């Protein structure tokens, strides 16, 4: 309610007695009028011209399109490139420390935050931008190919140049000690880190981008991981071993399948019925325990007949055991004991015949088969039975087709063969012999 309606006399404000304390929020900023004469710098405007004439002259004056106005103040452009913000893709966004002036790229924001958390020490450190540009190139000393990651270079040195990075002998044998620092340094001598390369690497041809191929059997695989597993069939490497028996295999899935046999060895299990049919469910051959022995320690007849003191140990990928397994009666490679071999001509007669009757179900894993011969071969992966043996080396397998494929590595056909100078084992390819020398005779190579 106002003072008039309340019956009160409105308070009168005396401008002479009013002070700044009563009206503290009232601030008046009075600017002087713009002197248009100072803007009139053209020769067509006189200095002593009245202001009204100057306004009229400016309104009626016409200037060309795009010409700079004489009334607007012109700001000088900076000649320094650092004072101007670039807007091109060649100059990315940067993060600058306000204390030490260190520059970080926008992608290194984590490093910028760590730099601020450490108190921004005024030290001369390397520039992250220059470090990101100086990418080190990994190149092979033998062929000069460059790679972006150490793993790709290691795979290239292993498959293309035969660099052996795995231990092919069993760990329990005294002839297979762990590699020392000198051996590791000698093995990694083919890998080097070279200086940064200024120019771009040459484009990779289509032949270099082809799928990995096995040097032994010339089989092409889809990836290096599949090639790695496939090479174990030639080298005899069995990195997965059972902790309850001497079973060893090349794939982890086969080891998991083998462990199911130990769970079914209780009385009344299906394994007892398998043993009643003449199949040994839990009697896998002993793993690889042989070592390369000098030719002088072996009898001449044993060397001539066996002829595989340090064979490449070619094995099937799913065979339970290593490449030194020669089936029942195999004492050990390099031992003077006589090893009985199966005549390759009589393989078909001595090998068990395949029955093509109705199939059945596996007692170990429950897998069903429509053909009894396939069930018999599959059951051997659980029992470790390998009736097909090679007469040139301790290789043994569960299928005759795999034995025939293995025999090609020895070059037993009509083609030319090469023999190992130390153990007289024949090979059909020079690459197979070279791999055999590196793995079985490293001190003589």
From Swiss-Prot:
InterPro entries assigned to the protein according to its UniProt record, in alphabetical order: Dev/Hematopoietic_TF (IPR051497), Znf_C2H2_sf (IPR036236), Znf_C2H2_type (IPR013087)
Subcellular location: Nucleus
Chief localisation class: nucleus
Covalent cross-link site, Glycyl lysine isopeptide (Lys-Gly) (interchain with G-Cter in SUMO2): 31
GO cellular component: nucleus
Tissues where this protein is expressed: Strongly expressed in testis and embryonic stem cells.
Biased composition range(s): Polar residues: 269-278
Domain of life: Eukaryota
ZnF endpoints (C2H2-type): 138-161, 212-234, 240-262, 360-382, 388-410, 418-441
Bias kind Basic residues: ranges: 1-10
Entries under PANTHER family matching the protein: B-CELL LYMPHOMA/LEUKEMIA 11 (PTHR45993), ZINC FINGER PROTEIN 296 (PTHR45993:SF2)
Subunit structure: Interacts with KLF4.
Function: May be a transcriptional corepressor with KLF4.
Family (UniProt): Belongs to the krueppel C2H2-type zinc-finger protein family.
Protein's name according to its UniProt entry: Zinc finger protein 296
UniProt source species: Mus musculus (Mouse)
